[in-house]
From Swiss-Prot:
Reactions the enzyme catalyzes: ATP + H2O = ADP + phosphate + H(+)
Signal peptide location: 1-24
Binding site for ATP: 244-251
Region described as Disordered: spans on this chain: 307-340, 467-520
EC number: 3.6.1.-
Acidic residues bias spans: 497-512
Protein name: AAA-ATPase At5g57480
Upper lineage: Eukaryota, Viridiplantae, Streptophyta, Embryophyta, Tracheophyta
GO BP: response to stress
Nucleus found in the keyword field: no
Taxonomic source organism: Arabidopsis thaliana
Pfam families for this protein: AAA, AAA_assoc
Length: 520
């Protein structure tokens, strides 16, 4: 044994001497060329081929990387020896993942492949036009050369299908918001996310059942309409405008839509977006099967009716697109600073965000705008193709009142005295109480259901009498039905749009006459 260790020590000494001799005789370039040649010879005689899937592809996140990560997370819990366990805040499940620089064996159609999760430190960059993550992440797929042509394409297609299936089954939807001031997170993403666990559904939503069914049918047709949109040459997207008084359930409607379709939500805070280009970058980083929300759009930036701000619009206008002309002016889109925060988003930038060329960089996405005052919005935001469906979130009516009684008290129509029910039906329209007001009245007395019914009826009566006395019913328009209110509000917006178009045509005609005079 002693002789063995002596021989081993002598051999190591010889190897160390040879290494130092090679480093002193052969330059680094020659050694590098030799290693490169040796690797090529090794790969020629190797029976395997390797495929690298990096996390970031150019400026965008590699969708295949995300799909592989999701696919392997469903199998490593069974087959992996070393796992990475994570659980997000407010999440209801633990996520399994492959540890850094660890590997796992997978089988597809009888062929065995090897996946390795490669994580290396990124070299410090002296200059970069955008920050990159400190770590380079990727997966390496090892397949035998003889199996490459047999399974590679079908295996990757299978991974994409399985990843989409896992996303659909995953109950933890995500709620995203854009980072403050356009900053990026540690992975270079402009969106921050938390698990979305809002309990609102269409069953609990206080709204006329016929209207809810109409919205649900429209959402279902959209989600199943990929072939239809391709056949008609339209981008696979849809826009919804939710408008009505505060407390009528606009946010609950958005949550119900997300839960019904299983989509993630991107809550876009426009006041944190400083330019049109930044808005486009945010759009590029959104995923398919998502709802992009801009709440209270009339309050976010200056996108109100251009006619009301016509005195601030620049006199130098293009001849071709009235909407883009006015959107880039200082009065409509806020070119220049908005509120002193350097916000230069224009109306044309927002319109291109919703239905321009950049809106087609993804598919199966829904845009939802909310506002309390539809008449204040610029008519360019309201036309079909941008906001395809206008949904009026009304005051509490009798059908929605019955839903609230069922939700909060567990009372059906048959559980309430008939005379009391008739009184409620007679006064609920005149009271103009929002679903939020009715819900609060029921919540505070939910332990005493009879008292809750009694006090709610008294509140409905007193508010109805006060509205009739003060002439405030339906905003002073008299006792109008919900349909008449919707028609009246949208008619005002359309009339405003026609007036703007007439005003633009007059200016274009005047400019044409000036040009002709100069030519003569």
């Amino acid at each position: 044994m002693k002789e063995y260790w002596t021989s081993l020590a002598s051999l190591l000494g010889v190897l160390a001497f040879c290494q130092s001799l090679m480093q002193s005789i052969f330059p680094p370039e020659l050694r590098f060329a030799f290693l490169k040649f040796f690797n090529r010879i090794f790969h020629v005689f190797s029976s395997y081929c390797y495929f690298d899937i990096t996390e970031i592809d150019g400026v965008n996140t590699n969708e295949l990387y995300n799909a592989v990560q999701l696919y392997l997370s469903s199998s490593v819990s069974i087959a992996g020896n070393r796992l990475s366990l994570t659980r997000a805040v407010n999440s209801s499940s633990i996520t399994f993942g492959l540890s850094n620089n660890d590997s796992i064996v997978d089988t597809f159609n009888g062929v065995t492949v090897l996946w390795e999760h490669v994580v290396t430190q990124r070299q410090t960059q002296t200059f970069a036009w955008r920050p990159l993550p400190e770590e380079k992440r990727g997966f390496t797929l090892r397949i035998k050369k003889k199996d490459k042509t047999l399974i590679l394409n079908s295996y990757l297609d299978y991974i994409m299908e399985r990843a989409n299936e896992i996303r659909r089954k995953n109950q933890d939807r995500l709620l995203y918001t854009n980072s403050r001031g356009g900053s990026l997170d540690s992975r270079g993403h402009p969106w921050e996310s938390v698990p979305f666990k809002h309990p609102s559904t269409f069953e609990t939503l206080a709204m006329d059942p016929r209207k809810k069914q109409q919205i649900m049918d429209d959402l279902k047709d959209f989600a199943e309409g990929q072939v239809f949109y391709q056949k008609t040459g339209r981008a696979w997207k849809r826009g919804y405008l939710l408008y009505g008084p505060p407390g009528t359930g606009k946010s609950s409607m958005i949550a119900a839509m997300a839960n019904y379709l299983g989509y993630d939500i991107y809550d876009l805070e426009l006041t944190e977006v400083h330019s049109n280009s930044e808005l486009r970058k945010l759009l590029m980083k959104t995923s398919s099967k998502s709802i992009i929300v801009i709440e209270d759009i009339d309050c976010s930036i200056n996108l109100t009716n251009r006619k009301k701000n016509s005195s601030n619009v620049s006199s130098q206008r293009s001849y071709y697109d009235a909407e883009t002309r006015n959107g880039s002016g200082s009065g409509s889109g806020g070119s220049g600073e908005e509120g002193g925060n350097g916000n230069t988003i224009t109306l044309s930038g927002l319109l291109n965000f919703t239905d321009g060329l950049w809106s087609c960089c993804g598919s199966e996405r829904i845009f939802v705008f909310t506002t309390n005052h539809i008449e204040k919005l610029d008519p360019a935001l309201l036309r079909s193709g941008r906001m395809d469906m206008h949904i009026y979130m009304s005051f509490c009516n009798f059908p929605s009142l019955k839903i609230l009684l069922k939700n909060y008290l567990g009372y059906g129509v048959e559980d309430i005295n008939g005379d009391v029910l008739k009184e409620m039906e007679m006064v609920v329209e005149k009271a103009e109480m929002t679903p939020a007001d009715v819900s609060e009245a029921l919540i505070k007395n939910r332990r005493d259901k009879e008292k809750a019914i009694r006090e709610l009826l008294e509140d409905l009566k007193s508010r109805g009498e006060r509205n009739v006395k003060d002439g405030k019913l339906r905003g002073g328009s008299g006792n109008l039905t919900e349909l008449e209110v919707v028609e009246e509000q949208e008619k005002r917006a359309i009339d405003s749009q026609n007036e703007d178009e007439d005003h633009d045509e007059e200016e274009i005609e005047l400019e044409d006459n000036i040009c002709k005079t100069r030519e003569d």
